[in-house]
Amino acid sequence: MKNFNLNKIIRPNILAMKAYSSARDEFKDASKDLIFLDANENPYNNGLNRYPDPQQRDLKQILSQIKNISTENMVLGNGSDEVLDLIFRAFCEPNQDNVISISPSYGMYSVLANLNAVEYRKSLLNIADFQPNLDDIFSKIDTNTKMIFLCSPNNPTGEIIKRNTLTEIVENFDGLVVIDEAYIDFSDEQSWIYELENYPNIIVTQTLSKAVGLAGIRLGILYASKEIISVLNKIKPPYNVNQLTQNKAIEILKDYEKINAIMQVLIEQKAVLKQALENCSFVEKIYPSDANFILIKVDNANKRYDEFLEKGIVIRNRTNDDLCENCLRITVGTEEENSKLIETLNSL
């Protein structure tokens, strides 16, 4: 980070381009009683006949109040995958640059790298504690390494990356460090969004799909410095978050007490599930989890996966992931769902 220069990270063509200005961008601060005859919309009101706010200002304002972060430090997208893709397109030169990610981790990083013709370099976690291997990560960095992806809490392992480990990476890498915090609401650790002023080279992504319970509307949030946000707004599709998504997100986020109450129930249910797993004969190891799921090592993952499926319970078989041989990932369900799961555990 000592030599971090954003202008050297941005693709030259992106640095030079001008952002597309949509019809609603031009009048985003205008009075709502204007007659809009500029965007070739159907003028008859049905609640959705107008284009949505391209900057999602009302939704960002609520997120700003919840997170205590300026709206100028946000980009919203059609799920986290869209904002992650924006990062690749803004900063990585196809067929030239590379990115590094811990492994095992979220599979879309490699998919997006391949989609954007960017070399993807895996760094295996330490098998003993599922923490990043710093020596290995730093050995993989070269002059064309633009970004390091760190999912924390990590999927599928469930563990949060130790803060001193993340700090060492952020402070000693001159590119961008992307911290994926999809599961941060289930952890006691403080989010890295509150370090944006201290570290201009970090990008933090979050989602409404997990703790908030809005996976069906697809809404991802990216937090970064105002300079990085300005770059991403250049290339973001103007109406990438539709009006129905914005409306539903605002509706649910207004009752954050209810969201917190549900999160607390899930955390309690995770403890119940963990205790049941500890008493299960075919479970060989239960990995620590700061997320809403538990990764377990069993005697035969393929066999146990099929047995659960026969009982009508779908879990995730991670046995083909790096370092996850014979591992299953179980999402914490409702009390009723967990009871059915525990009943099945006891019957196998």
Regions found by a protein language model. Name each.
Residues R57-N98, N116:
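Phosphate-binding glycine-rich loop
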Residues N201-N279, I286:
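PLP-dependent aminotransferase class I/II
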Residues A128-S187:
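Active-site phosphate-binding strand-loop segment of PLP-dependent enzymes
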Residues I267, N279-K311:
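Conserved PLP-binding catalytic core of the aspartate aminotransferase-like
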Residues L6, E93-L150:
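PLP-dependent aminotransferase-like
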Residues M1-Q65:
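N-terminal "arm"/small-domain region of PLP-dependent enzymes with the aminotransferase-like
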Residues N164, E310-K311, N320-L348:
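PLP-dependent enzyme catalytic core of the Aspartate aminotransferase-like
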Residues S70-M74, N95-N98, N144, E181, ...:
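Short acidic capping loops at alpha-helix termini that bridge into adjacent secondary structure
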